[in-house]
């Protein structure tokens, strides 16, 4: 099996890392080049002036607003950016801005630089993009960021809920890897030990620093960011989202279909990890305690969802991506089995 691995070429992490932007742009775009900056209005209001002060007089740039992560908007944005003819695209903001930037860069065939301002999920370093309205409710392959600039001062000042959600996305690797191994054993699917161990290492660091991450301690946020980058790199190495996404993500995607916008991605997959760990016969209670220490919801009620929504999502999850084998099997869970699972793990009352 021929396996091509595309990795980020430069990663800058630390306090004041944003100041490395000019150096990174010189390396990947060149002086006096034209770049497109895709960012949300709030991020641009907070950090746009700083961005300008770093790049002004060095490169030409145009700002494009990341309004929503829908396919329809991504296509409109693509046409707007295409008219500007940039040599490089910068995603500056949260997951939405970075996903849109990866999609636009991929369609234009240019490089992309990821500059995250919040750590809500592991898309900051991965070659996969999640857009609403795709025929499949999961990530699709686009482009690997050529460089990642993660300023811990900026990221640690993000809302605590986003920080906790990022940790939830890493906790999910505990069941994602078990699902991947299962698919390898039962279906003969390719399994990459190195990518799997790299993703698991990210989860283990979150467990170790759970209390500090849950409080938003800057040093722990750095550990979280490095874990998110490592998870993205694991996906690059594997050539798929397998090291990062299993049955817990299928559950989260099902939730998004039933109750869109009710919870953050990391919150959903963390809740799913508790239940999927139970199905795997693992220490789900330890997972639940860790998620609680992170300050993440561990019940449907805390997530603002009804018991029925949780059970329905569990029964739907195996159909979200039928080609991806997980602990849910090919037939999935009956309503009774799903309800029992959610009750035993304390997700529903």
From Swiss-Prot:
Q: Which residues bind NAD(+)?
A: 95-99, 117-120, 126
Q: Which GO terms describe its cellular component?
A: cytoplasm
Q: How is the cofactor bound?
A: Binds 1 zinc ion per subunit.
Keywords, alphabetical? Cytoplasm, Lipid biosynthesis, Lipid metabolism, Metal-binding, NAD, NADP, Oxidoreductase, Phospholipid biosynthesis, Phospholipid metabolism, Zinc
- What residues does Zn(2+) bind to? 169, 249, 265
Q: Recorded GO terms, molecular function? A: glycerol-1-phosphate dehydrogenase (NAD+) activity; glycerol-1-phosphate dehydrogenase (NADP+) activity; metal ion binding
Which SUPFAM superfamilies does this chain map to?
Dehydroquinate synthase-like
- Keyword check for Cell membrane, yes or no: no
* Record-listed substrate binding positions: 122, 169, 253
EC nos: 1.1.1.261
- Tell me how this protein assembles: Homodimer.
Entry function: Catalyzes the NAD(P)H-dependent reduction of dihydroxyacetonephosphate (DHAP or glycerone phosphate) to glycerol 1-phosphate (G1P). The G1P thus generated is used as the glycerophosphate backbone of phospholipids in the cellular membranes of Archaea.
- Protein name listed in UniProt: Glycerol-1-phosphate dehydrogenase [NAD(P)+]
Gene that produces this protein: egsA
């Amino acid at each position: 099996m021929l396996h091509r691995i595309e990795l980020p070429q430069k990663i800058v992490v630390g306090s004041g890392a944003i100041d490395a932007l000019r150096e990174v742009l010189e390396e990947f775009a060149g002086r006096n080049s034209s770049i497109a900056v895709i960012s949300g209005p709030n991020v641009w209001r907070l950090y746009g002036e700083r961005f300008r002060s770093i790049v002004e007089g060095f490169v030409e740039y145009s700002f494009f607003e990341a309004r929503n992560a829908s396919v329809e908007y991504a296509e409109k944005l693509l046409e707007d950016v295409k008219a500007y003819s940039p040599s490089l695209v910068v995603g500056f903001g949260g997951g939405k801005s970075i996903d849109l930037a990866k999609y636009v860069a991929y369609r234009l065939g240019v490089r992309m630089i990821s500059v995250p301002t919040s750590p809500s999920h592991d898309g900051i370093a991965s070659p996969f993009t999640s857009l609403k309205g795709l025929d499949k409710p999961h990530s699709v392959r686009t482009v690997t960021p050529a460089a990642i600039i993660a300023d811990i001062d900026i990221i640690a000042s993000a809302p605590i809920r986003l920080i906790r959600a990022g940790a939830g996305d890493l906790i999910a690797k505990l069941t994602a890897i078990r699902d991947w191994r299962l698919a390898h054993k039962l279906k003969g699917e390719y399994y990459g030990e190195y990518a799997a161990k790299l993703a698991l290492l990210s989860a283990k660091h979150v467990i170790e620093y759970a209390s500090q991450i849950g409080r938003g301690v800057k040093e722990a946020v750095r550990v979280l960011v490095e874990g998110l980058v490592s998870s993205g790199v694991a996906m690059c190495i594997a050539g798929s989202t397998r090291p990062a996404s299993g049955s817990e993500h299928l559950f989260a995607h099902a939730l998004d279909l039933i109750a869109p916008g009710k919870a953050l991605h990391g919150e959903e997959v963390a809740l799913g990890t508790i239940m999927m760990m139970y199905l795997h016969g693992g220490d789900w209670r330890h997972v639940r305690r860790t998620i609680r220490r992170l300050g993440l919801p561990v019940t449907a009620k805390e997530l603002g969802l009804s018991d029925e929504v949780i059970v329905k999502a569990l029964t739907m999850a195996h159909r979200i991506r039928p080609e991806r084998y997980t602990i849910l099997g090919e037939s999935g869970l009956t309503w009774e089995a799903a309800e029992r699972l959610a009750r035993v793990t304390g997700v529903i009352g």
